[in-house]
Amino acid sequence: MFDPETLRTFIAVAETGSFSKAAERLCKTTATISYRIKLLEENTGVALFFRTTRSVTLTAAGEHLLSQARDWLSWLESMPSELQQVNDGVERQVNIVINNLLYNPQAVAQLLAWLNERYPFTQFHISRQIYMGVWDSLLYEGFSLAIGVTGTEALANTFSLDPLGSVQWRFVMAADHPLANVEEPLTEAQLRRFPAVNIEDSARTLTKRVAWRLPGQKEIIVPDMETKIAAHLAGVGIGFLPKSLCQSMIDNQQLVSRVIPTMRPPSPLSLAWRKFGSGKAVEDIVTLFTQRRPEISGFLEIFGNPRS
């Protein structure tokens, strides 16, 4: 009933408002167009057009069919290529989780553009998570690949890892903060007087990692790195920031880097993906990262020197 040729004919008549104009568009005779529409109406059991001597207009049923017909036709026309992609081992959906530390909107857009060009029928879902929330998505929420899991060893033997690099940290505060000019190293008693600005671990099942905070110290939780940086610049509180994100602000004296009794060690991050069952799209993403291709360079800027 709704074969591609019939749908094309119906759409052409609906858009042109004329059997003859639809015939010209489709390189058919007017009689052929009229016959196909008549047959479609007989098969559906409803009138799809109001006919006058000069034009045809859609009935309510015709309007409803038109609202669906374009999508149906597009689906039917793309199905052979879509089936070929599935037959070639390409996933129908790929879920990618990205560590908040590596999340870069431009890098995400560049990766999606590259993937969408090669896999036009694959659905891509991007999630942004914090600390152990990245592993959580892989282990418990069916994600295919993670950009920036914590550590260099997998939490389950069903995953492969490729170390990406280590994030270096600086303890910072606003340039006009009361502790900015106090003799180093700053003591815990001095630090405890001011709020720690942190981003909360987004893990739902795994144990959350606790960010830097002294016992009895006030903590301010913000949703992302952009807000955390803004809070430090505004003098709201103190805490650690990735060196690559704050060094320019230290250099131009917007922020001050200080030494405290317990400095944060570098944080190694890795690419992680399932060892078994991965399709071509995931394999291609892994290749982009293992070969350090330009398409993914934006994700690695935070390391300075990848694999460090």
Curated annotation (Swiss-Prot):
- What name does this protein carry? HTH-type transcriptional activator AllS
Organism for this UniProt entry: Escherichia coli (strain K12)
Domain of life assignment: Bacteria
Gene transcribed to yield this protein: allS
Q: Which first-to-last residue range defines the signal peptide?
A: none
Q: Which GO terms describe its biological process?
A: positive regulation of DNA-templated transcription; regulation of DNA-templated transcription
Induction profile: Induced anaerobically and by nitrogen limitation. Repressed by AllR.
The entry's DNA-binding region: 19-38
Return the NCBIfam families for the record. Answer: PRK10094.1
